[in-house]
Design a protein with these regions (language model features):
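Hydrophobic alpha-helix immediately C-terminal to the catalytic Tyr-X-X-X-Lys motif of short-chain
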Residues: 22, 26-34, 46
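Active-site helix of classical SDR
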Residues: 19
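Active-site-adjacent segment of SDR/Rossmann-fold oxidoreductases
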Residues: 8, 29-41
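SDR active-site lid
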Residues: 36-122
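A transmembrane-helix-recognition feature enriched in membrane-embedded lipid enzymes
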Residues: 115-151
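Residue(s) in the substrate-gating loop at a strand-loop-helix junction
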Residues: 3
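Active-site loop immediately N-terminal to the catalytic Tyr-X3-Lys motif
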Residues: 8-15
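Terminal low-complexity segments of carbohydrate-biosynthetic enzymes
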Residues: 150-162
């Protein structure tokens, strides 16, 4: 699994982006290398957008970094209410994302359709599109659609996976 942050980058996440871009490059290269070896072999790279998990709440960081993360969160366009603590940031992140059961359904659908890249969530698809249309200035376009994504995010679990 890569991330939408294997397609686009934001300040302050260089190490994270490096790993996610690496996963994307490795997966795409592997898919090309293996293309003629076995017609039944499928290779996919999953690029989730904002999925409601504990990733932000369980992240460990130095106190100085944590303070900067909270300060940066106050300027973020990805949240309605700026966090006052790491715990609050983790809670808001989990509550604000797509339910993991819906993400799983999208992944399975992408695998069934043999998609090489599987984008999870409208946010992931729009961030990817903004990068393709505006390669040097994509981050400046996010303010146009992120508020709508926050309003219409699908946070409900699938009934069969509750």
């Amino acid at each position: 699994t890569s991330s939408i942050f294997g397609m686009v980058a934001v300040p302050g996440q260089s190490a994270y982006h490096a790993t996610k871009f690496a996963v994307r490059g490795f997966t795409e290269s592997l898919a090309l290398e293996m293309a003629d070896t076995n017609p039944n072999l499928q290779i996919h790279c999953v690029h989730p957008g904002h999925i409601g998990t504990n990733i932000a709440g369980t992240a460990r960081m130095d106190d100085r970094v944590a303070k900067k993360v909270i300060e940066d969160g106050k300027k973020s366009i990805f949240t309605w209410k700026p966090p006052t603590s790491l715990e609050e940031m983790g809670h808001e992140f989990k509550q604000g994302g797509m339910h993991p059961s819906k993400a799983a359904k999208i992944i399975l659908s992408g695998v069934k359709k043999n998609k090489r890249r599987i984008f999870i969530g409208l946010d992931a698809r729009l961030l990817d599109l903004s990068q393709r249309l505006f390669p040097k200035h994509y981050h400046k376009t996010w303010i146009l659609f992120v508020p709508f994504l926050l309003l219409f995010r699908d946070k409900k679990p699938l009934r069969s996976l509750d």
